[in-house]
C-alpha cells in the first residue's frame, strides 16, 4: 500500500477528494476529536484502502501514525466519524512509509 498522490482523486466511500480528506479531524461517536488524517492509502490497483491517521501526543510530539481502514470511517455532517474511542487507536496497525 502507498499514499495517494493525486489530490483530485475521489475517495468513493466518503464522496470527497483526497485533498478534502487530508488534514480532516476524526471524531468518535460522542463528538470528541481523537485523530487527524495525514494521508489516503491506496493499493496497487488504485483502490482506496484506508487513511493514515495521527493520534496521541501533544502538538505532534509523541504522536503516532496508524492505518484506519476506510470501512471504519463515515462522513457525517461534514465530519469524519469512527465507532472507536481514543483508547482503541493504539491497537491500529502502525503506518510505515
PLM regions with names:
Residues 1-97:
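Peripheral interaction segments used for macromolecular assembly
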